[in-house]
Amino acid sequence: MNINFSDVLVLGGISVSFLLAYQAIYFYFIYSPRAKKLGCALPPVFFSFPLGIPEVIRLVNAWFNDDLLEYFTFKFEEFQRKTGFQSVAGQLWIGTIEPENIKTMLATSFKDYSLGFRYEAMYGLLGNGIFTLSGEGWKHSRALLRPQFSREQVSHLESMRTHINMLINNHFKGGKVVDAQVLFHNLTIDTATEFLFGESTNTLDPALAQHGFPGPKGLVTGEQFAEAFTSALELLSVRVMAGAAWFLVWTPKFWRSCKVCHNFIDYFVFKALATPMEKDQEADRYVFIRELTKETSDPRVIRDQALNILLAGRDTTAALLSFTTYYLGAYPEVYDELREAVIADFGKEDAEPPTFEQLKQCKVLQNVIREVLRLHPNVPLNFREAITDTKFPTGGGPNGDQPVFVPKGQKVFYATYVMQRNEGLWGPDSTTFRPDRWNESREAIASGWDYIPFNGGPRICLGQQFALTEASYTLVRICQEFSRIEVLHPDVITSRNVMKQRMRLTNSSSGGVIAKFIR
């Protein structure tokens, strides 16, 4: 049977026409009547002809040019609302930056939503962990992990102190120009692995970073593990962004990197499981993985949960410290005010680590951190999928004040980054770094659900106090040691004069944070 090119074109045209017709029929003759019956109204709807393919091209282009967050900013400007429909690759997505809708999805109607395709997309590296599971599996994970993040555990700063001082003494001192973003990632993986496993990767110390940990194919160094973890996360983020087509995204390097990560962590898991309980009780410091073995003896469960926590413990805190350094260099008057407050509260010397409560009481320090997290939330973009027919309280109708129908299977994205910079919510200086806005009353600044840097509702980040404590202590030590920070601004700036940001699972600066710390 011979098939010529014209036959293929005809067949393709028929297929596209069929899919277009199906999409239109579904929306106008199935979705709309059901919405009306439930007292809901339509939000703005944007079809990208044909089948949302042009929108896919724009998304891919934004991804490769590190313009993804600007793309979503533009998208909501196009909606001219805080909620709207967008056609992407033949699917209709609901996008929202409306605080009440996000509150409904994350809290009020939490049980109506799941993570959707995210489980399958992330399973290869993270397995059955708190960031991949929904429903009963997620509940079990949270119950297992919550006791491990009590204030007593996360406020012990002595173990962080060694690594923070290593960063300052070996890398920041001497007036060297460094990429602070890279070094903060090294710091946070060193502190996270010490908290989780009782032994650090020590990537900030060139000598100790070459220390090998036993694996099935020989020794794996902390440096090799850190590289494999970074490599695996890079492709993992592509799989998540690919949505329902996640299974098309894989490479041999991804699976090799996952294997290195699994083998590295298995060493600590089996070591903890083999430690007699009475000997473990004699240990003078808290180790996450040892405590977890008291709750379960399943090595796969322990490994998966440890990997999930490592993901949160490394990238989010590193991003917070990186963006904070950038702003403190760009706004020297803010750094001067912060340094003055730190020296007044903690002195010029690192005599002993401050307490958790002392860090929280340093108002200028906390204002700086809050403002950085407003402009650069840890997870700028997130997704959910409705597992039952439900609705948003607002966003529909000509004035955007009527409910919006969210049918079972509907995919939703919410852009925390866009919401926390929205002028309608935060005022005319919404994109300006201004920490003193947090001196105003909370009600005057925001309503509550328009500021969710660590997410919200039952899935709010368990490790947020760990991240805030580490970031706060690191900034205190920087202020104690250095009179100013010089930052070479990234060469690549967007059309809106905003720093280009590399959006993956979390967020980072495209050009790094090239800085010099002056004593």
Swiss-Prot record:
The chain crosses the membrane at residues 10-30. Induction: Up-regulated when grown on alkanes as sole carbon source. It is found in: Membrane. It is an enzyme of class 1 (oxidoreductase). Coiled coil: none annotated. The keyword Iron applies. Its cofactor is heme. It catalyses: an omega-methyl-long-chain fatty acid + reduced [NADPH--hemoprotein reductase] + O2 = an omega-hydroxy-long-chain fatty acid + oxidized [NADPH--hemoprotein reductase] + H2O + H(+); (9Z)-octadecenoate + reduced [NADPH--hemoprotein reductase] + O2 = 18-hydroxy-(9Z)-octadecenoate + oxidized [NADPH--hemoprotein reductase] + H2O + H(+); hexadecanoate + reduced [NADPH--hemoprotein reductase] + O2 = 16-hydroxyhexadecanoate + oxidized [NADPH--hemoprotein reductase] + H2O + H(+); (9Z)-hexadecenoate + reduced [NADPH--hemoprotein reductase] + O2 = (9Z)-16-hydroxyhexadec-9-enoate + oxidized [NADPH--hemoprotein reductase] + H2O + H(+). It comes from Starmerella bombicola. Pfam families: p450 (PF00067). Catalyzes the terminal (at the omega-position) hydroxylation of a fatty acid. Probably involved in alkane metabolism. Has minor activity toward myristic acid, palmitic acid, palmitoleic acid and oleic acid. This is Cytochrome P450 52-E3.
